[in-house]
Amino acid sequence: MDLNIVRLRIPLAAPYEQRLVTALSTQRAAIEQHLANLCRRTLSSDPELVRRHQKPGLPFVLSVPCCGVLDCLLAGPAIAELPAVVATVTDLAGMPHPPQLFALDYQGDVVLQRPRGGAELPVLSLAGLLDLATPRYTACHCLQVQLQTPLRLMAEGRELRRFEPVRFARGVLRRFSSLVAHYGAAGNPETFIRLAELAGGMRLVDARPLPAPQGQRGVLGSFTLQGPCDALGPLLDIGALLHLGKGASFGMGAFQIRPLS
């Protein structure tokens, strides 16, 4: 399984940052109109893929700007749409000129300033990132999940109001496997079936929830999990790049994973 991605960092002055924060929560229709080529999702002609994954998620993630920085991830077909993404950010933030861009490498370090797209973009492999993350979780049985923006997960037709470790882990696996299947190389589906079964062994040992910002719904806070973290930790770690739940492509459901022991 694999998926090509590009990670970008865009510095923002304070007024532009606040406008983008507002746009991500209130102007999603405008963003989808700007990025029509990426938001026009069509079902695959492969009936088995549709049965397993249904409608694909959007192949990009615009993080909520923080501390003067907007992080952006482009996956698969979105990489070729970099000019449209830059134009969208420029327009919604009300910038007079396109912003500076910084491309990131496998370690999250800046390797290229002002990429213009095409062959010069440093394209990363999710499989490569997974390989790099795996040693951090060797013999790991406990990890911490830090929910940084409200997570809105649906289960059995209802929105979860508290953190549930099994649903969280399986949600990350579903999002990861769906994006890989639709926009990359799916690999062996039995791998995700096995991991989903392992996720049933994740249990919550410490919860420190936080209230969602005024006017927003979702789960926030820090949660400590025990279970088969050596097997699931690397994929949860890399899954953090993709966010999770409702509004994931627009900054919601941002999280970080940290091995504890």
What do these predicted regions represent?
Residues 1-261:
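RNA-interacting cores
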